[in-house]
UniProtKB/Swiss-Prot annotation:
Protein's UniProt name: Protein TonB
One term under GO cellular component: outer membrane-bounded periplasmic space
UniProt domain TonB C-terminal: residue ranges: 199-283
Residues on Cytoplasmic side: 1-5
Residues on Periplasmic side: 28-283
Bilayer topology: Single-pass membrane protein
Protein function: Pathways of utilization of iron bound to transferrin, lactoferrin and hemoglobin but not to haemin or citrate where dependent on the TonB system.
Gene Ontology biological process: protein transport; siderophore transport; transmembrane transport
UniProt keyword annotations, A-Z: Cell inner membrane, Cell membrane, Membrane, Protein transport, Signal-anchor, Transmembrane, Transmembrane helix, Transport
Bias (Gly residues) ranges: 150-178, 185-197
GO molecular function: energy transducer activity
Transmembrane regions: 6-27
Pfam families: TonB_C
Amino acid sequence: MDKERILTPAVVFSVALLHLAIVALLWQAHKLPVIESGNVIEFVDLGDFGGGGGAPEGAGAPAAPEPQPAPDPPKPVEPPKPVLKPAVTKKADADIQQPKEKPKPEEKPKPEPEPEAKPAPKPAEKPAEKPSEKPAEHSGNASAKAGSEQGNGEGKGTGTKGDGTGRGEGSGKGSGGAKGEHGEGAGGSGGGTGVGSSKGNPLRANGSIPRPAYPALSMENDEQGMVVLSVLVSPGGHVESVKVVKSSGFSRLDNAARKAAQNGHFQANAWTEFKVPVKFELN
């Protein structure tokens, strides 16, 4: 195909040159000679135009012939123009392959998150049972039938109350003689009962504080709302920490409520977490 494309213009150009050469030869063969025209000078004798002999003027010499106009040169024959035929070239079909779409990988379904196991609620601590006073067993001497009195022995256990949980039991034994002697008893001691608390596991209670001062900018901007605080109090009433459980939507009101709770005083004999609502309202 490339060789045919190169030879076709060369052949057309060669044929055109041959036609031009033939036309030039024909033109030279039929070319007519050009007649050169010029000025003709004639000498005329003035005596011939009349004079002393009485002859009329102009009778002595014949009139000069009028010059004939030169014939028009023949028009040159225009050679036929060579007709150039457009070279037809065949275009090879481009071997273009459209890229095939790759199949999209199927999305695997995401595994649903397993629900977190909630810790089982702690059972409420039951107050320890108070130590029951058990009457001491009494025994008499079966062989002493003559004694009218029997001896009884008793024992009691005592304990003091304190923080924490515990159980204490007291027991006593007594023996009686035939003569009605008093028995001897011994009492046991044990811990008291009570509900314990710590900083990590404080008691829960509701509390309140006096209404704090309304921030000036909040009053100008007409800010209102309720703040719920979580106040951790140590034994003795000292405030350990203050957290905002529910915000009012305005930071100035939240900070005012937190500051008032931090400077407040609560009554607590154990670690206690108070839930304190503070309401800001413009009258």
